[in-house]
Amino acid sequence: MAIMHKIGCAGSEVETDRVLEKDQANNGHFVDSDCCFQETGSTGTANSICTLNDSEDDNSSLNSVDNNECTNLDCGGKKHKNLSPNPSFHVNINAAEFIPKSHNGYAPKSMNPPPEQLDSPCYPHFDQDSSSVIYPSPPSTYYPNMYVSANTFIPMPYAHYTDNMYHAKPVNRPNFLPREGTPPPFAQQPAEQFSPFNSEYESLLDFRALILGNLPVDYKISELLSLIHSGPLEKIQSNPGKRRIIITFLDSADAFFFYERYHPRGFIFHGRPLKLTFARPSPLPESIQNFCSNTAASRNVFIGNLPSSYHEKEIEEAFGKFGKIEHIKILSKKNIAFVHFLNIRDAIKVVRTLSCDPDYHSWRIFFGSDRCANHPPSFDERSCFTSKQNPDTTSDRCRQQESKDNGNRTVFLGNLHTKTKGHEICDLIRHGGLQDFHYIPEKHICFVTFITYSAANAFHDYLAEEEVLLHGRRIKVGWGKESGPLPRVLEDSILMGASRNVYFSHISDSLTTEELELILRQYGEIESIKYLKNRSSGFVAYTNISNAMKAVNGLPIHPLFKKSKIRYAPDRCEQELQKSKSNSPIQQNVPLQQFITPPFSYPVAYCPAIPPGSDPILNFGIQYQPFIPFTAVPSFPFNCNVPNYPQTSDHEND
């Protein structure tokens, strides 16, 4: 195999023509039978025979025959410098690169180059923080038999090196180039990309459950939960045979807050400290999350218009079939009650079922606030919990504390009169469509949730700046609980024209208003109904858009509404009030001149000339009418041709 090489040296260029042949008689050595060094500018030509040991011996190296004295007669016996490289390197002709050699074929344990090579630019310099080394192009004086070109356009060979094969900690390194059939050492293998947050159970958002251990034998869950005021709960799990209980919060930030508050000093219950540990993490179900976002669901069910005959036993019989009840509180003077369940799913079932039940149509059944969410007064002085690894774990309560009106769509109305009706409150709202309208007449308060943030801010500013009275009382305004962004399902439905107002037509004439209300109330709480019996049509406004969506999908299936047309109608809360017509010419943009112009034409004799320099055109675009003195006005302006009667009275001389 013939190979042409050009090796650049300092001050000279050497051209080498080599023919490497396999000499079977030379014990498997490669013999360079024609190794002719022609040095330009020298007195002669140096010829030498070089051999490359190709054996499997670990001590194989480059050897040269007669390294000190040239055997070529034309050279005149000129002595040359020793051209032997460091014996710890060998040449890979096929790969055209050289790799440090050791006992196992990979990285050497130690390298001791000769002193003259330490200062050489071709000697490889290793960095402690790097796992690879770049070999620059060596001069021919050090590596005469290296098949390396000095041409800068040819890429330089790379050799990977590590100073310690067994690191205490795996690190990422470039791919090692081992010999065939030998795996790379452990230090050269790429480290696995592992993150503690890759698993769904490693996210901080899922750590919502806490185990309370070391409970007394005779304890009540209601007594224990009355001491917890860190945030609303999703469920409470207890086992009668074990003296422990598992409480699951809706928000992981509340769970961390409760743990950090009571873990150092202990949670004291019945004179004994309880053990606090985190349970297995579990994500919040999507169905419960949507219900909490849309309807502010909780474990607490609020009951309004409660009959006086209902006591705790009757309520437990009526609501106990949906799930286990944790606590019941009845306010007989206000005819209201609060029922706390052990699981939020049971409370959702109650609201969805009984709010549409005709037997309970006179009751007001909705969600109340969880009594575990009542924070102590010192909460404002504490800092809110935020995870450094996951900033999204900041609770909604903390965000509301930082900025009350930052992206909030819920407006609070207070100081309402007892005679105030729900439709009267909606008649005051003309700033945008509503997502939810929750009026609590027993507490004289109301919560209005708009579709957009801008509409909520406009309505809040309107009530804050203007003195709005309703039944003689000024309405107090504030911000309610942060509503968060609009759910994607409602957002898409609103873009398609959905609203809380539903139009129906072509219904049976035999239906009365009471019967129609019972049918429409099956899909949710109603704010107002407008029934046009003569036209067999009407409008129903629900308190929530979700209820209106149920009615639009469910009414066409009803037997009495098969022939009727059901569709959404615009929400009246997003329609601006029509301004009353005014007789003021300024508000009607009517020129004032037509009102001050007399209803008759002046005689020519009574029309004074327009003074010079005056503008005959006013801003109104009507010809200027000069001012006429009182004496020049005729006595009878009904006709301009009437004679001029004397202006004196017949009784002046009497």
UniProtKB/Swiss-Prot annotation:
Keyword GTP-binding: no
Residues annotated as domain RRM: 299-355, 409-482, 500-571
Gene Ontology molecular function terms on file: RNA binding
InterPro entries given in the database record: Cwc2/Slt11 (IPR039171), Nucleotide-bd_a/b_plait_sf (IPR012677), RBD_domain_sf (IPR035979), RRM_dom (IPR000504)
SMART domains: RRM
Compositionally biased spans, kind Basic and acidic residues: 394-404
Region: Disordered, residue numbers: 383-404
Entry keyword set: Cytoplasm, Meiosis, Repeat, RNA-binding
Gene Ontology BP annotations: meiotic cell cycle
Extent of Polar residues compositional bias: 384-393
SUPFAM superfamilies: RNA-binding domain, RBD
Subcellular localization(s) per the UniProt record: Cytoplasm
Reported function: Has a role in meiosis.
Name the UniProt record assigns to this protein: Meiotically up-regulated gene 24 protein
Record organism: Schizosaccharomyces pombe (strain 972 / ATCC 24843) (Fission yeast)
